[in-house]
Amino acid sequence: MRKLKRWQIPFFAFASFGPCMLSTIISVYLVDALQTAGFGANLEQWTFAGKTIVAVGLFSVMKAISSLMDGLVEVPVATFVQNLKTPWGRRRPAILVGTIVMTLAYVLFCFPISYEENSAANSIWCGILLTVFVSFFTLAINALFGTYAEITANDDDRLLLTNIKAAFDTIQYSIAYALIPVFIGFGINIRQIGLYMAPLSLTILFAVFLIKENSTMPGAVAKYGDNVGATVEEETVSMMDGIKMSLGNEAFRAWLIIHGCFNLGLQMFLSGQNVLISGPMGLNGFQIAIINSSAFAPVPLMLIFYRKVMAKKGYRFAFQTALASFALGMVCMSLAYVRLFPDAMIRMALGATGGVICSYGIGAFFSAPTAMPTQIAADEKKRTGKSHPSMYFAMQGIVNSLVSAIGPGLIWVNLRNVSLNGNDMFGTHAMTYIVIAFCVLAIFACKLLPKEYDQLGRKEKAAKK
């Protein structure tokens, strides 16, 4: 594979912007838009029809199945991509097919079969489309992220790529969490907004045009890399060998535990954020935009601060501080509760304060899930000569799928319907405390990382070398 030039890295980092935006919108907004539970202000705009058009129990099962299916296809997809034989290489065909199918499923999700209340047909229809979406999103993104370790020339370029991607992730989430509530406040329905966003999947074309990979067909001659003109020798890796290789890495095993802990809480929060702010916090579209802007606007600066902490204290300590900041921000948001503070200005101030505190953790959360598997895969290639980055992302993806099935899929879908003593927003408000608990668990799980992660990223170490 031809290495990226320095000026090409920002464009390559931007490639995942559109597909990830669609994934955020469908998981955070469109799935919630099928039912009314937990919403307060702007109910007609936040939902497809101002009423619950799915059978909640059945749809929660279908949503959990979609998350589990996503996990089940992770490893087969990684193996398929790793061993794909085409004249255009392994990555580009997988990226294109995955993006086209996921975009079609996304658009169809915006068109329920009917607008009847508690519809079983809608539950099945939307559940199937959600399964198709997440499966082919996995194919496209696994193939794309699998190039990160191979398409960069050195560790500095790799770090630059993941940092720029984290910055684009910040913009993506700012649009999703800050601007979309503004559009809702203007009276635009979430279904329309979702359809307007669909063409963003075209950003994947940056990767399609920038990836220059040798043919993987038998007997093909290399056009790129260190052996131009020689016959391409592609290593075939079985599914079991790929699993053993990834799970045999001590640092990666520890990372999976950490990632699973904090990501369960994070996904619950991101999936239910609009319901939390609209319901228990009792804020409207413009106020929601302020809260979300306070959480995402400072992220680029917080990433710089995060890197400074890492340069002084190492990766483990820096990531623990990020987890602690997110938990503290959740405490502030839990206090911004209509039953505690009837004054909307006080609630908005508490929510904005919590958002700013959370932004430090958000910056780290954007960077780490791409940086860690990429770096581990690159280190493995240096150590063993074998390159199987897709499998690391696949195993991390399985953890993502499991926590999605447990957190947003089962806990959140049902928790938001829990009431206590006539308080219909009790379950939605309780979500903040669950997020805090999982952040604390992740802080302790960081101790499982190998000792060298106390030194990873420290400038003193680099200076000695």
Where are the predicted features?
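Membrane-embedded alpha-helical bundles of multi-pass transporters/translocases
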Residues: 2-465
